[in-house]
C-alpha cells in the first residue's frame, strides 16, 4: 500500500535544503509556491539505514527515486525515475502551489538494510548551477560572464517575485472587498427582514384588538 505524506508547505524562496526520513514505498511530498515561468532545480541524495552499524550509509546502492511534480490542477510537469542521487529540473507554467513528490522504486533493500531511508533534498528556485558552469569556464572572462549572467538572473527572479506578490496582494484585496460587501448587504437584508416582521406583527396585533373590540 502506497503511503503519501505532505512534509511541509513553504512560500517562494531562493533555496531550501533539508533532509527527511522515508519508509518502504512511502511517497513524501513538499509544496512550493512558485511564480510562473520560473526554473526549479532540485538535487537529492538517498542514504540507506544499516541495521548492523545503526547508522545511515553514505549511499543506497541499487536504489532509485521516482520524482513527480504536479500542480493543483493535476498538470504533470515531471515524472521520471532517477538513481540514488541526482538532479531534476522543471519550469512552472503558471503561478501557484506545485507539489514535488519522491518515492523509492524498490523494496529489495528491506531484506538487508531495513526499511528506513534518509533523503537529502535541495530545492533552488530560479537558479542555474553556477559552480558547474564556472568549473567549465576556459578563462577568467568566461568566469566573469557566467557570474554576471547569474547575477542578472537573480535580479530578474527578484522582480518576478515582487510582481507575483503584488498579484497575490491584489487578489487578496479584491476577495476582502467582496467579502465585506457581502457582509454589508446581508446585514442590510437582515434589517429589512426585522422591520418587515415588526410591521407585520404590529398590524396583526392591531387587527386582533379591533376584532376583540379592545380598541
Swiss-Prot record:
Transmembrane parts of this sequence: 168-185
Cell compartment(s), UniProt: Endoplasmic reticulum membrane
Signal peptide as annotated in the record: 1-17
InterPro entries assigned to the protein according to its UniProt record, in alphabetical order: Emp24-like, GOLD_dom
Residues carrying a glycan: 105
Residues covered by the GOLD domain: 27-125
Main location: endoplasmic reticulum
Span(s) of short sequence motif COPI vesicle coat-binding: 208-215
Topology with respect to the bilayer: Single-pass type I membrane protein
Key words of the record: Coiled coil, Endoplasmic reticulum, Glycoprotein, Membrane, Signal, Transmembrane, Transmembrane helix
Family of this protein: Belongs to the EMP24/GP25L family.
PANTHER family given in the database record: TRANSMEMBRANE EMP24 DOMAIN-CONTAINING PROTEIN
Biological role stated in the UniProt entry: Part of a complex whose function is to bind Ca(2+) to the ER membrane and thereby regulate the retention of ER resident proteins.
Protein name: Transmembrane emp24 domain-containing protein 11
